[in-house]
Amino acid sequence: AKKAIDSGDFFSYPPVPGYLDFREAISEKFKNENKLNYSNDEIIVSNGVKHSITNVMYSILNKGDEVIVFAPFWVSYSAIITLADGIPVYVNTQIENDFKPTKEQLNNAITDKTKAIIFSSPCNPTGTVFTKKDLEEYKEVLENHQDIIIISDEIYEHINFTNEHCSFGSLENMQNRTITMNGFSKAFAMTGWRLGYIGAPLQIAKSIKKMQGQTTSANCSIAQRAGLVALMAGNECALEMKAEYLKRRDIVYDKLNEIEGIKVNLPQGAFYFFPEISSFFGCKDSNGIQINSANDLSLYLLKDAKVSLVPGEDFGAPNCIRLSYAASEIELIEACKRLKESLGKLTSNGG
């Protein structure tokens, strides 16, 4: 990036879909890592995956079109669908099933208004990884509905503890109806660079290009040069980060299982736990204030334990809270200790 700045060659507007050499590198990444064969013209560089999702929804949705969303989901999915005049249709899942919907649930959610389905793997907020077997089951359902577009958010691809990431578009006869999204925030810790990309069937990619051309235009030229270097450098840093996250996950999992009243599963990717905490609803703190929701519990823990958690309501799971383990081992151990102490103070009778 510094070299690009010093050269003075990248101060003009880049092409709307991104520099050709960058899109070529993304195409090679898709081919080598994901078994996807998107041409350069089927790739659009964006200002991050949220921008990609926005481009996609505004490009494919007409007013009243439905988009199936696996819940829990990343909070922006439902908001962006609604902004684009679409209707989110939620498929609710349970922690006992690792937050994976059954193919029967998927089939029951489909109507004649269904335009697309969106999910992330690994998933934020649950850490769920959809295996090839899982995706094959969903494919069985979707083969009976050829007009439905699949939107696969793979931003956490390299924080996958199963070591078997599967892109939905790599399944037989699925690439021609799958939009694959990825970026640099997680694998390369480049959150501030705002750099994402889409691989999409050509006609959809053309529509996305038009949409982006009339809104943000191209992504920052210098960010693209940094992204190109990151792709060329390979995944060694991502593998190192994944190993660290795996150690932290195991530490937090053991600590959370020591806390009475919390129901927790073992996430297979990303860097979040999403425990079920509804057993604390109806309990009271030492001031007699009753806990009635995940939001109430999160506020209580912020005040009493000085631990920041995200309530599950906006993720489509009102009985859960999200805990990130993107912190040091010392901080995580201390946080779990505080959570245990503060939750232990809650009583059902206010005593």
Regions found by a protein language model. Name each.
Residues T93-N163:
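Active-site phosphate-binding strand-loop segment of PLP-dependent enzymes
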Residues D65, G86, N144-I149, Q175-N176:
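A short helix->loop->beta-strand "cap" motif at the edges of active sites that frequently abuts
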Residues A1-G48, N55, L231-A233, K345-G351:
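N-terminal small-domain helix-loop-helix segment of the aminotransferase-like
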Residues N107-N108, K284-N292, D296-G351:
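PLP-dependent enzyme catalytic core of the Aspartate aminotransferase-like
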Residues L171, N176-L246, D250-I259, E341-L343:
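Conserved core segment of the aminotransferase class I/II
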